[in-house]
Amino acid sequence: MVVFFGSIFSARIEMPGRTAKEKALLDAVESAIEVVRPEAQRQIKTRMFYPYISDSSFMAVCDDTLAIQALETNMPQYGVKYTHPVDKIRQIDVPVVNIGTFGRDGHMLTERVDMRQTFQNVPNITYEAVKRLLS
């Protein structure tokens, strides 16, 4: 039996708040949540680790060089059929957050989302966070 990683690599995103940029973004999001929370009707949760596939995986790399090398070693097609632009992503290196909705059956015919979260809370949290970052 041969075991290897066969899918493309989508880097995990972790925001521990170690840098000034990370702290500023986290503070802006937390402040935005406090503004929106009274009208949210549901609990708004924050997580410092986002384990799902996201386009934000192309904005920062949280893994060190040894972890990336271990991944490449365990992907037989790495460098042949697939490469991940780690060096270019490290040049971008911006803190990211995923302010998103929730629902059921994502990307399926039966997909549905919580309308208040999707069309009210998410835009308002995003707006408030950006406003704080730019002020």
Name these PLM-found stretches:
Residues 1-135:
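An extended, acidic, His-containing surface patch that forms the Zn2+-binding/catalytic region
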